[in-house]
Structure formats: structure tokens, C-alpha cells
Amino acid sequence: MKAIYRGMCPNCGGAITDERLAEKNPCEGCLSEPIKAEDYEKLVFAVRNALKLRGTLKDWEDLYRLNKEVSEVEDLFKRATGFRFWSAQRTWVKRILRGKSFSIIAPTGMGKSTFGAFISIYFAIKGKRSYIVVPTTPLVVQTVKKIQDMMERAGVNVRLVYYHGNLKKKEKEEALKRIKDGDFDILVTSSQFLATRFDELLRDKRFDLIFVDDVDAFLKASKNIDRSLLLLGFTQEVINRAWEVIKLKKQLAKLLQAQGKEKEVEELNKEIEKIEREIERYRRENNIGILIVASATGSARGDRIKLYRELLGFEVGSGRSVLRNIVDTYIIPERSIEEEVENLLRKLGKGGLIFVPIDKGIEFAEELTNYLKSKGFKVELVSAKNKRGLELFERGEVDYLVGVATYYGTIVRGLDLPHLIRFAVFAGVPKFRFSMDLEQPTIYRVLGLMSEILEFLPQEKREEGEKLYARLRRLIRNIPQYELMKIEEALAEGIELEGFHNHVLDVFKQAVEFLREVLRDEEVIRRISENPFLSLKEVEGKLYIEIPDVRTYIQASGRTSRLFAGGITKGLSVIIVDDQKVFNGLIRQMRWRFVEFEIKKFEEINLESVLREIDEDRKKVRLVIEGKISEQVKDLVKSALMIVESPNKARTIASFFGQPSKRRIGELVAYEVSIGDKMLTILASGGHMFDLVTTEGYHGVLILKDDGKPYYVPVYDTIKRCRDCGHQFVDWEQKGVCPKCGSRNVHDALENVKAMRELALEVDEILIGTDPDTEGEKIAWDIRNVLSPYTPNIKRIEFHEVTRPAILKAIKEARDINEDRVKAQLVRRIEDRWIGFELSQKLWEVFENRNLSAGRVQTPVLGWIVQRYKEFTESETDFLGLTLENGISITIENAKGEVKEVEVKDVVIEEREINPLPPYTTDAMLQDASRFLGFSATKTMQLAQDLFELGLCTYHRTDSIHVSNTGIEIAKEYISEEIGEEYFAPRKWGEEGAHEAIRPTRPIDTGRLIQLIRDGIITLPRNLTKDHFRLYDLIFRRFIASQMKPARVLYEKAIISTPFGDVEVEGYIEILYDGWSRVKPLPLKQIPKLEKGQKLKVTEIKQWRAPKVSLYTQGDVIALMKERGIGRPSTYAKIVQTLLQRGYVIETKGRKKLVPTEKGIKVYQYLVSKYKDLVSEERTRQLEKIMDEIEEAKADYQEVLRELHEEIKRYIRS
């Protein structure tokens, strides 16, 4: 037993040990001996029976009942289909049994339609009514057949009614009569039927379950959202109230951007909460039905869809995946494009898509198709006018399809045939082509061109272009494609539009005119022609710009790699390079979007092995589609819950895998995505949820006896935080009331635990992805403990950067909790509490001030600041500053008087190599951010935390300077492209350890990052401030410099003789080779060349008195902590912050120097005079070492606690 958690027993809600929780059992008060069983379900049943027998059964009954009902539903499913549930289907059933509405995000072959049909039968057996809404008549027929087959197999009979256009007249009449009379348990129709027959036949009906298969068709009539809500039991009045909340939240978002609107924000929040309470009351008092929406491929647009969020607690996501499992390759052609394509098809076999770039157009696509036909290939051309080829391809009558590579092209977007499409060939790089006068411009192409050429414009024009670009992007964000086409047509035909659309047209027009104007500038054209990433071509006397069309490449190549039940099919893409510059641009943009993107020469891949993998995946997909999948493959798709600390991190991770669906669980938001082999729900825990209590044991730690020796067990309870005054505490003095200000507006982390337990019930496994250090490990341990009884499997995942490859790798390498790290953190917290409480109480007694407090690590640090201040005040002296005729400035200490001339006594000039510094560790970053940016340590850590959580930098709490291979690759790419490959000098900088140095996660500098965020290529869950960019720039430059060749300078060191003594001057005369100084200034000043014996006139004299010793900044103090082995990367900033918060130290305004206050000096003197050995620098350093030993399993943590306890008794309690 390591700890006790109050209020966490899953049965009685009382106190329970970590051991019992890990054994998935209730507390000892409920069951004297723990129950063991071979699997989770059996354990739940056995514990329930034991509790019942003992007469202590309480909340465990809910857990038992849920598992029992799932078993019953699964038995029926087995009878109806012959299969057991997939993990994902089991999750869906658990949600339904608990009355939750949700959006299903799941890949091809996950049995969504089968599940919808089955669950309606289950509801019918239970006397409940269901409605299945599908997009088309063939799907109505298919769904009805599924239901009938299942009823027959399961031997049940329920009343089924369906309606579609192919029914005979008499059948239609009978169906309509039965619908009108409510003579059915299950109704199946198209979404069109819901839209047209609602008022006449459905308005008065009430359903327990509505299953919407394919939300895209359903949403074509946005009124269907209101209709579905009415059918589930809401009134129009409640729907209108929810609509009010949506509008109020929009207003609130705007107010939060403005300054000084706190009062309005508070009032709006109150109004929103009031309406939300009304809605919640209505839901409680009325038995509202369940809505299940099978995921969209497009994104659900418009505000009306948000009604589902307000009334049913979920948001529809998009099933569109951004995962790629594609081998990207290229060929530099040695013969005609047609011959290269023919040659490739002979090597690759059947099942290919061939994309012709837009500059070659439909004519070339026709020529290529005819050429391939003449060579004996079964191939068809597909275009908007001729889609016949699609059916022939699907039926296997043709082996290849040819189409033009445009974003909305028929075979670029419309094909989802994971079992048939094996590879894609690009007969030229996908590109946009623009004539200089921009004939027939489209909105997306204009945005693409603007984004590419803004960097070539003069400053003033660039700023104008950036504003126009941002406006146009913002305006079109929620406009569907068909409406954009109307705007484009209006511009071409020179006609006006109505209202908002006319406003968009106006801005579009301005953007086109802006481009036409800047493209007449010869300097701009010259710069474009020299750029290696876009192409300038003359065709028939006309100039054209060609830029890569990366969106089309992603979409088109993506046809070869689809998400299916069990993973992502492997695909192959081959680009025949017809323009090297546009190809370079395409690669660069792919790397911006996909951290893991790499492209190889086609002849360098192992083609046989790639094709074998491609074909194995196609076999699996066919089996899934035909329903012949084996049990073993079925369990490839697990439902999993990933828990991280912060909402930013949760949102960033979710965004890697498409547009997530969202569910509100209590006060938390869960994001759901599919990653092929996992249906992943991502949730933010909100960081630390537990802390030591103050009302039990010795300051929250029980002291028990084990073999006559004391044994220490911390007691934890949830952390409470007052939303009004910010006070944080653990023990209630009065339940629900803040002990500091009396407010009832208090958040208890218990609510977060309940939300996590609710989600834990649904899934097969939990992955805990808290920060990769001892603190993160302790949070993970707490989460593991309190969730253990609710789920069969819990693992810890660790990642040092928030990027898609790092997350997927962490999931693959999931491990158990590192108990030694946890023990080290337990000791750190207990030691902190004991010393803190004991010393604070002494300070209260002596100074009669209950606001004072003390800690072991802060005390020596406070001492350094006190000592430095003393030296500062005692070191005042006279300074003389001389400026010489050649511009050199020198300062002389202890000097007063006039000087007219000085002489160069000695000079050494030599060539010197200056190496770059290693990339940042935490302490070095804090020092530089303090020195160059004027940031406090706390501010820097918060900004770095944001950059980490947003996936822009690696983990920022580290004392390692090591750079991984990934890091070296990033530097290589940036240096080669932006500076020159000859500057690259890879360095590992030290041994590989648990952590890496702080570095960027992509080869993108600050200017480019700002542009990519502006262009929407990088989308972040929160806005970055100017200070985020300043810190990113510091980290980026230091890292890139660390991977560049040394600089070489002509170094000079001179001794200058003055009447007051000699002064040394050093610097460089000139840079011989710039090396890393291309990205960061050198640490030396440039000085003029001097000669021995040279006499120099003094042109300016300044005299002043000042202290010789300067005061510390936050950066200086952190450098000392690192140097003297006190504190850790995770505590440096906190230690300084604590001293400032307690008022022991203040920071001067301008130069940000640290000055001890009178209170700080008195407290320090008292502590050192009474408890010197306890708070000495040496003892603190020793303890840091002991913590490391516990972490490395070299010290027994109980033994360490015994020593600490003895030490405190010896020094304080005696």
C-alpha cells in the first residue's frame, strides 16, 4: 500500500487504498478480502455477488448491471448475426444502455449499418420505437433486408414499416397508413421522406431511438435537425431556448476578444447558465430518446447543427481521415510521359488511378487514355460529363481510370474503393497554372497564388496582400463549394449578387485586381523566376506562373490509402516529374502538412515487398466488406480512451486524425477520432486532481507500523478551486463553500474523476498520456488508480513532442506506470509538505503573520538573492567610460579624472573558430528568455508549455542537450533549403537519455510559421501571441545554429594602457566564414584593427558612481540553481515564482533585477539561525540526489521518508 484516496471506493464512495483500486476491488470496509478472477467481466460479477452476500452492495450494482445488459445484448447479436461484438460495437451499446446520444466516427467495414439495424430490433423487443433514416432508396431496401434477416435468425418478430419510391401503389398506401396510425416498432425511410412527410405523418410521433445513417444527406435539409429533435421528445420552445444559447455563446466569444468587458461577460455567462439549467431540467423530467449519427465524410457546417451539442451533448465530427499510409515516390522521366505511364502500369499491375495535371488538361487525358488502350490496357477516362468508367471499374470491367488532377475532380474526391484501388500515377506534378492577367480565376486558386507570392512583394504591398488574403479566407470559411462557384461565375460574368455573397464577391474582386497589379511589376517577376519552388513559363508568347496543388495531391493519392476496420490500407503514389521547381514546392508543402512525409525515387524502393503489402491489405478489406472477417481481425479495432492534462493538448492530438466528433461529459469535452486500429476518445483531465489532505495523520501522512518500523502512507483527496477568488484547497471546512471568500462557486476535481469514470466504462483500454516526467507519472498513477475498477486495461504512453508520428509511436509502445518515478514524486511532495508546514508554523509564531511560509529549496535560493543584494549595496565605486576615436568604448573601475589619449600596449590577432552553443535545456532557455526577451521564468514556462502542447516544440522540462535523429533531419532539411547544404554540420550533442533538448518539431522558422498559420495550413486549437512567436524564434535559432558549421573570425585581443591602469579589449575584426552566425549573432563584438604602440584620442568621457556587483535577474538565479544542483527543470520557475508571490523578493520594473524585501531578509535570517542544517544548500542538494536515486530504484523511498521524519523531529519538533 502506497496511498489512501478519500471518496474513491467504487462501491461505497469512502476511502480506499491504491492497492485495492489496482486490484479493481472495493475498499476493505465493503469487502474484507479482495476478489480475483481470470477476466474483467467475471471479476465484476464475482465482486457483486460477494458484496450482496455481505450486505454491503451499493454503487457496484450499476457497474454489474451495465456489464450484464451488454452480455444480454451481445447474446442477441450473436443469434441475429452469427458474430460477437467488435470492441467498437460494445462501446456503442454501453453508450446506448446509458441513454447517451453520439456521433459514430468509424471507417469502412466497421458494421455501422448492421449495428443500426440490430439495435432497433433490440429496442423493439424492449417495447421501444426506433426510426432509421438512410440517404437513398437502395439503402432503404438494403436496411430492411438486414432487419428481416436478423429477425429470422434471432427468432424474433417485431413490427417493421418502411417506405421508398420503388414500392407498388398498394404497398405505399398500406405503409403510409401504418406510419400514420403508429402501427410499427421500427420505421425505415430516406431522409427525403422525413423532410417532405414530417408534418403530415410524423409530427405527433415519438421515438426512443433515431439512427441516422450518413449525416451528409440528412443535413441537406437543415430543418431535419429540428425534426429529429421533435421526434425525440423536445418541444419547439425548448429547441428555441437552445438556439438562444448558441447565439449567446457567439456573442460571448466576441466579448472575450475585447478589452474591459468583464461585466458583460459575467452577465452573459449567467444568462447562458440559466437557460442550460432549464434545458437540463426538461431533459430530466421528460424521457428524451437517443440519437445516433453515423459519421459524415464532409464537415457538418452551419450553426443549426450545434443544437445537438446544446440538447444532446455531442457534436457531429467528420469521418474524413488525414492519416496516410502511402509510399510516395517519383520518377525523373527519360522518355515521353505516355511511355513512362505505360512502363509503370506493366510493373504495377491492375487497380490504378492515373492523374493528368491541369496544365495538360482534358485533351492530354484523352490522348493518354487512347494511347494506353492501343497498348492493350483496359482503361477509361472519367470526367464530370462522363462517369460511366466508375461503374465499369467497380464491376472489374476496366483496370485503370484516367482523370484530371483538380481538387473537386470526380476521381480525386468521389472514390472510396479501398479493396480495388492499389496505386496512383501522376502524369506530371499536380499544379495550378495562372496567366499573368488571371483569366477565369477561382477563389481557392487566387488564395493559393497569393500565399505563394506574398513573400516576393515589397513590404507595403505585402502587408496590403496579407490583409486581403486574411479577409477572403475568413469570409469563405463556412461557404459550401456550390455557393463559391456562383460567386466565381458572378465575377466572370460581371454581375452583382445579394447581401453577404456580394460582399464576398467584392473582396474576391479586390484580390484578383491586387494580383493583376503586382504581377505587372518586373522586380516581382524576376524574384518569382529565381525561386526554386514555383515555375514561370512562357506558352505561345504568354507568361504563366505554375505553383504546386498540394490539396489535390493529398486527396488524389489518398484514394490509395483508406481507413478500414483494422487499419489503413497501404497505397503507392508515383509522380512523373514534368517540372522540377513545382515538384520541389510540392515536397516542401507536404512536409509542412505532414511531419512524417518522405518521398523516394521509384527505382530505389523494394517494389515487390510494397506490392505484397498492398495486396495483403486488399484481401483483408474484401473480407471485411463481405462480412467474412475472422474473429482475430475483428478485435484489431479497439475502443480506447486517451487521457492528457490540458484541453489544448487534447485538441491538438485530436486534430491529427481528422475533424473529431465531440461529447460533453460533465464539465469536460471528449474528442473522438478513428486511427484505423483504434476508436480513440481523447480527454483532458485538467492536470493534478489529488493532493495531500491537511486533517489526517502527520500533515496528511499516516504513520503506520511495519515490522516495528514506521511506514508512511499519504492520504489524498481531490483538489478544490474557488472560481471567484482562485483559492486552492483540499479539505472542505463547510461542504461546497470556499474557506477563504465564502463563495459557492467552487470546482471540485471530483467532477473530473466522475467524467473520466463515465468514459472508462465504455472502452476496452485507457492510455494515459500525461507529461513525460515524475510529476506527469504521478498524475498518471492517480488516474490509473481511480479508473482501474471501471476498465479491463490501463497503460501509460509517453511522448516528448506532440506530433502525429510521436503519438502513434507512443500508442504502439504503451507501457506500465513507472512505480519508481511515482515513489520519487511521493517523497518530493511529502517532504515539501512536512518542511513547509513545520517551518511555516514556526514563522507564524515568531512573526505573528499567518501569510508567511517557507520551503526547503526556496530558502537557499532566497539566501543567494539576500547575499547578492548585500554585495551590491557594499560595492559602490567610481567608473570612467571612454569612447576612443576609432569607436571602441572602454570602462575603467576606481577611476576619476581627465584622459586625452590612450596607447595600445599589446595586440594578439589570430584566426579563431567559434562553435555554436548546444540547443536549449530548461535552465538555458529560462536564462536567455530573461536576458533577451525580458520574460519571467513563469511566463517562459507557460509559453513553452503552450508551444509543446500545440505540437510546435519538444518537451520543455529537460536537462538534456541530446538531439535525436528526427531533430537532425529537421535541421538538415531547413538548412539545406533555406541557407545552403554546405552549412549543415550534424551534432548529437551528448548521450541519448530519457529526454531530448528543446527544439522545434518541424523545419519551419518563425516567419514561415506565421504565414502557414495565416494560410490555414497549420491550424492550432488556440491563437498564438507575439510572445509565443518570440520564444519560438529563440528556440528555433538556437537549435538550427547548433547543427551548423562553426564560424571563423579574425580574433583580436588588445591591452590598452591608460593613466589609471591597463584595460583588456577583445572582439573580432572580420568574419572569415559566417557558419552558424547566419542565424544567430556571434557572442563577440566587432572591433577595429589595432596596432601595438598606436595612440588613440579620447573623443568622449563619462563619469559615474555605481555598484561593481550587479543584482541577479530571474535568469541568473536559475543558472545558479542548475550550477549548484538545486531544483529540477520542472521546479526552477516555481521556486522563483514562490519567492515573488510570498513577497520575500520583488523585481525591479525596468531592468527586472531581484531585490529582497525586509520581510524576505528577516525570514531568511531567522530560518538560517534556527534551522541551518535543515535548509542549507548542501542538504538540499543531497536530497535532490536522493530523489534521483529513488527514481533509478537505487534507494528505498520508505527509508528516505523515515530519515526525513527523524530529521524534522530532531531539528524542529525538539
UniProtKB/Swiss-Prot annotation:
Domain Helicase ATP-binding: 93-256
InterPro entries given in the database record: AAA+_ATPase, DEAD/DEAH_box_helicase_dom, Helicase_ATP-bd, P-loop_NTPase, Reverse_gyrase, Topo_IA_2, Topo_IA_cen, Topo_IA_cen_sub1
Residues binding Zn(2+) 2, per UniProt: C722, C725, C738, C741
SUPFAM superfamilies per UniProt: P-loop containing nucleoside triphosphate hydrolases (SSF52540), Prokaryotic type I DNA topoisomerase (SSF56712)
Zinc fingers (RG C-terminal-type), renumbered ranges: 719-748
Binding site for Mg(2+): E645, D771
Topo IA-type catalytic domain location: 818-1212
Protein's GO biological process: DNA topological change
Binding-site positions, Zn(2+) 1: C9, C12, C27, C30
Signal peptide location: none
Binding site for ATP: Q89, A106, P107, T108, G109, M110, G111, K112, S113
Membrane-traversing stretches: none
GO MF terms held by the record: ATP binding; ATP hydrolysis activity; DNA binding; DNA topoisomerase type II (double strand cut, ATP-hydrolyzing) activity; reverse gyrase activity; zinc ion binding
Cofactor: Zn(2+); Mg(2+)
GO cellular component, as recorded: cytoplasm
Keyword vocabulary terms for this entry: ATP-binding, Cytoplasm, DNA-binding, Isomerase, Magnesium, Metal-binding, Nucleotide-binding, Repeat, Topoisomerase, Zinc, Zinc-finger
Catalytic activity: ATP + H2O = ADP + phosphate + H(+)
Task performed by this protein: Modifies the topological state of DNA by introducing positive supercoils in an ATP-dependent process, increasing the linking number in steps of +1. Binds to single-stranded DNA, transiently cleaves and then rejoins the ends, introducing a positive supercoil in the process. The scissile phosphodiester is attacked by the catalytic tyrosine of the enzyme, resulting in the formation of a DNA-(5'-phosphotyrosyl)-enzyme intermediate. Probably involved in rewinding DNA strands in regions of the chromosome that have opened up to allow replication, transcription, DNA repair and/or for DNA protection.
Subunit field text: Monomer.
Protein name: Reverse gyrase
Organism from which the protein derives: Pyrococcus abyssi (strain GE5 / Orsay)
